[in-house]
């Protein structure tokens, strides 16, 4: 292949590294209203009185909106970017009189500049009726304090939700008699694991610009992963027709799932729709830390039974998830905690997976890379590591005895057959590359330091089966180059480049001959958006099929120009030729002919959805140096092997893997969202919220052990999310080998390690 599976430079690389104006605030008019939000200091309260009279007198203030400007009995909406009907409940209003977490919106202010808006905000007087708050998610279910007592709360999908019980979702699934199987096992590992909420912490915070166009429509330019879902969300929130809204995205400075939720778009949209004036909102880092959509905190109870030879016979998993004040992504993230961890163990005779998602008066959780699988894999993989230790079996060996293989039906994965899998090769590659036999389990380095190793494996999905869709539109232009229009959002991942590579491979042209446009609800074909590890697999397949259709049309027109039957010509990349090569029509000639007196449009549009979601696989091993006296733990080496099918662009795939590994290490060791006894988030800046920098980590090495997925473009599967999952169990197991103490809660802090070392 000439372009696919080749390390091509990103199409936008030079513009980004040279600091060209490509992000939202770079490209919008600066003469617009500045929108800011007054937020509640209380975790649960009713706004009794709000006085904005003095604030409205501040010069430059255009408008201040409160709950009085929003129909409190109107239909609610969700900010979750999901295909309709969304599993997430409709539990929000633009401004609600009932504030449900410390940071919830009390008022929207709009003015000519930040100075006047900040001054006006200080002059607003609010009197609250402070209510008891649900701050412990263990006590949320059936608590007498209801987070959502309102009657206009609504759940569109059958996810087991009940707002009168603080229940956002409940589900049960299983196969076989799990109790009988566990009773017959030689050994059962039974533990409860706890993963904290953690922030996506993308460099570009939430931001949106809104204006009214010449047709009176609301135009929205937003840093979002989900332009089409965002249009529906805004229509639902503002109670206006979707036809009156256009949503587009510029370049995005990172998302990691945070921008799969419309966190900020509704507020400038509300202002602009009311005032008919352009407006923008840019969240500060403080706001992005205290009023965003962090990963769901989860508690996972695992019972895992096996034979004395280490064959896993049964897995019983119960997950309790804290969705916070609103239910965005609550019903769906929790499912992945079981359905993306249990299927790795193909010899299990029985499984049971039960989950509850509860409301609390914490900041609303949301989507974050890994989307629930991360939490579930930490628990299940940690249990398998403990099983290996208890039986005296090497962790790699016990997995080789249990893993699923190509052609196996995957347990807890909706009956799907494993259509492509190199998990066995991934295990061997990581085992060899890290020098496992020489380093396992721990080595004393002297001076109070030890080096230990740990490992884990992971899977994810490739899109959402039979739900989300990807689309592509492709046309040839008058000089013989192509324009690819997509609705997927490149958020720094390089999907514009990858999708162009797929088109270029089919059309046998240089990558530079394919220009990419997207995403824009007015001009792009419908696409669910960039999430659920779907872009390469789902949208990429649409691009491949679209390019094939366009190539066929080009051959039809070329054959007509040559006076030949369509079956007598061949496509040669830059031309259509007769089979013997004696006659030739160039792409430029064919494109020009299609634009003069032609009834044939040299354009193709394809929408694609997959009935299966083939999982990518990954194995990772961490070498961690631990100072037993100070508790400092540093990952000095991380080895990973990934099966993502055919890597369309190995360089970009490797960058994805390295970044995900770094995020996973942060979740294992430092990242944590905590609250004080009033429900106020404590880590409100990047000084308190510690994300690892590149120099905090030693050597990261990634290899690809490729299977071939026949349903993907050129054999490709996803890679975006699976890469974050292995560091959690791997680092935790390495620290166990260093300290001889198991940790069942993340992050594992320096203080905890120091105490264990003593």
Task: Tell where the protein language model's regions lie, with residue ranges.
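Flexible, low-hydrophobicity surface segments
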Residues: 1-160, 274, 595
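Short acidic, glycine/serine/threonine-rich loops at helix termini
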Residues: 74-79, 120-123, 222, 231-233, ...
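C-terminal catalytic domains of large/alpha subunits in multi-subunit enzymes
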Residues: 67-68, 239-244, 274-279, 308, ...
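Glycine-rich loop/linker segments at domain edges
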Residues: 6, 12-18, 82-85, 161-208, ...
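Conserved catalytic cysteine-centered active-site region
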Residues: 85, 97-98, 241-249, 273-284, ...
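Helix-loop-helix junctions that connect adjacent transmembrane helices in secondary transporters/permeases
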Residues: 147-238, 403-481, 606, 611, ...
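Catalytic phosphate/nucleotide-handling subdomain of diverse soluble enzymes
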Residues: 462-524, 539
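Thiamine diphosphate
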Residues: 232, 253-276, 280-281, 495-503
């Amino acid at each position: 292949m000439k372009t696919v599976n080749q390390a091509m430079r990103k199409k936008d690389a030079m513009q980004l590294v040279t600091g060209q104006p490509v992000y939202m605030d770079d490209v919008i008019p600066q003469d617009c209203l500045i929108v800011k939000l007054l937020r509640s200091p209380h975790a649960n309260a009713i706004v009794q009185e709000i006085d904005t009279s003095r604030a409205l007198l501040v010069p430059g203030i255009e408008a201040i909106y409160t709950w009085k400007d929003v129909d409190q009995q109107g239909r609610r909406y969700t900010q979750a970017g999901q295909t309709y009907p969304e599993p997430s409940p409709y539990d929000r209003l633009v401004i609600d009189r009932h504030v449900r977490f410390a940071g919830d919106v009390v008022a929207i202010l709009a003015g000519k500049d930040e100075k006047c808006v900040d001054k006006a905000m200080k002059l607003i007087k609010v009197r609250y009726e402070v209510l008891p708050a649900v701050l412990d998610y263990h006590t949320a279910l059936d608590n007498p304090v209801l987070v959502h007592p309102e009657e206009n709360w609504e759940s569109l999908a059958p996810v087991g939700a009940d707002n009168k019980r603080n229940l956002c979702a409940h589900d049960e699934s299983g196969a076989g008699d799990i109790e009988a199987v566990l009773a017959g096992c030689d050994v059962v590992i039974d533990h409860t694991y706890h993963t904290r909420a953690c922030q996506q912490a993308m460099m570009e915070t939430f931001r949106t610009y809104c204006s009214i166009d010449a047709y009176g429509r609301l135009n929205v330019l937003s840093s979002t992963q989900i332009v089409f879902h965002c249009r529906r969300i805004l229509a639902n929130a503002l109670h206006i027709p979707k036809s009156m809204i256009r949503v587009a995205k510029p370049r995005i400075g990172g998302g990691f799932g945070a921008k799969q939720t419309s966190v900020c778009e509704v507020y400038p949209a509300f202002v602009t729709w009311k005032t008919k004036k352009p407006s923008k909102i840019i969240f500060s880092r403080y706001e992005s830390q205290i009023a965003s959509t962090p990963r769901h905190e989860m508690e996972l109870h695992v019972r895992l039974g096996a034979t004395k030879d280490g064959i896993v016979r049964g897995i019983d998993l119960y997950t309790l998830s804290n969705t916070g004040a609103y239910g965005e992504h609550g019903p769906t993230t929790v499912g992945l905690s079981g359905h993306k961890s249990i299927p790795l163990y193909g010899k299990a005779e029985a499984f049971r997976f039960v989950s509850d998602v509860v409301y609390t008066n914490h900041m609303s959780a949301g989507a974050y890379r890994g989307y629930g699988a991360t939490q579930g894999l930490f628990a299940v993989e940690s249990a398998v590591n403990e099983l290996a230790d208890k039986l005296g079996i090497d962790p790699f060996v016990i997995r080789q005895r249990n893993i699923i293989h190509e052609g196996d039906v995957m347990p807890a994965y909706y009956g799907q057959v494993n259509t492509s899998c190199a998990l066995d090769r991934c295990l061997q590659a990581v085992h060899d590359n890290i020098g496992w036999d020489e380093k396992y389990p721990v080595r004393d380095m002297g001076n109070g330091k030890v080096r230990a190793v740990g490992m884990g494996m992971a899977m994810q999905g490739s899109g959402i089966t039979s739900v989300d869709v990807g689309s592509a539109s492709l046309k040839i232009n008058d000089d013989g180059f192509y324009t690819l229009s997509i609705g997927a959002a490149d958020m720094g991942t390089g999907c514009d480049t990858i999708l162009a590579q797929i088109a270029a491979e089919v059309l046998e042209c240089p990558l530079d001959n394919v220009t990419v446009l997207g995403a824009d609800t007015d001009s792009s074909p419908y696409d669910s958006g960039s999430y659920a590890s779907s872009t390469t697999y789902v949208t990429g397949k649409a691009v491949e099929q679209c390019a094939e259709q366009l190539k066929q049309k080009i051959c039809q027109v070329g054959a007509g120009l040559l006076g030949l039957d369509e079956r007598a010509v061949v496509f040669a990349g830059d031309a259509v030729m007769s089979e013997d090569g004696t006659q030739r029509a160039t792409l430029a000639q064919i494109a020009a002919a299609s634009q003069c007196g032609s009834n044939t449009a040299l354009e193709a549009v394809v929408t694609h959805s997959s009935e299966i979601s083939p999982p990518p696989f990954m194995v990772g091993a961490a070498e961690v140096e631990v100072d037993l006296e100070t508790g400092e733990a540093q990952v000095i080496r991380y080895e990973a092997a990934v099966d993502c099918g055919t890597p369309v662009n190995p360089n970009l795939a490797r960058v994805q893997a390295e970044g995900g590994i770094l995020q996973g290490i942060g979740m294992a060791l430092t990242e944590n969202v905590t609250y004080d006894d009033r429900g106020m988030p404590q880590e409100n800046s990047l000084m308190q919220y510690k994300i690892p920098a590149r120099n905090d980590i030693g050597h990261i090495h990634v290899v690809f052990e490729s299977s071939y997925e026949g349903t993907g473009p050129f054999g490709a599967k996803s890679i975006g999310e699976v890469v974050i999952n292995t560091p959690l169990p791997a680092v935790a197991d390495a620290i166990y080998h260093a300290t001889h103490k198991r940790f069942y809660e993340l992050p594992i802090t320096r203080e905890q390690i120091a105490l264990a070392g003593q």
